[in-house]
Amino acid sequence: MKLLFPVFASLMLQYQVNTEFIGLRRCLMGFGRCRDHCNVDEKEIQKCKMKKCCVGPKVVKLIKNYLQYGIPNVLNEDVQEMLKPAKNSSAVIQRKHILSVLPQIKSTSFFANTNFVIIPNATPMNSATISTMTPGQITYTATSTKSNTKESRDSATASPPPAPPPPNILPTPSLELEKAEEQ
């Protein structure tokens, strides 16, 4: 239900296609009714051709509760403090404060589920990135630096070629016949 509710709420808040041509006198994904006038406890959300789309108090309460409690507050107090300009403080104190607050922030961005790898003591080198892309499959990216490729080329030329496999003697029908005659 938690996964479907954001989709449901976003669809409810967008302009919906009129379903009146099918014969249904409903609007807003079936949660509202097309009427000439809304009742006292109902609210008008959108238009159904020449009529009003009226939504009952339960649906209004459902939407309000979702908007109030269902959507997490991205900008909580700590983030708002972090965004304010600091007075009489050094950059080190600001950095320590930001680093202490970062684990508490829940990110809702596109990169929230992306894993990042940080390599300490990395030296900048010329690198070549090779990306393999096949439609409908996972993309794998291989990155090799100049020094790594040179080492691998040198090691490939320095190593001796593999020994050929021992020759397999396959029995021929004539040899089998000779052995059978000897017995």
Curated annotation (Swiss-Prot):
UniProt protein name: Beta-defensin 129
Region (Disordered): 141-183
Comp. bias regions, Pro residues: 159-170
Family assignment from sequence similarity: Belongs to the beta-defensin family.
Annotated localization: Secreted
Keywords: Antibiotic, Antimicrobial, Defensin, Disulfide bond, Secreted, Signal
Organism of derivation: Pongo pygmaeus (Bornean orangutan)
Signal peptide: 1-19
Domain of life, per lineage: Eukaryota
Major subcellular location class: secreted
Function: Has antibacterial activity.
Listed GO CC annotations: extracellular region
Record GO biological process: defense response to bacterium
Disulfide-bonded cysteines: 27-53, 34-48, 38-54
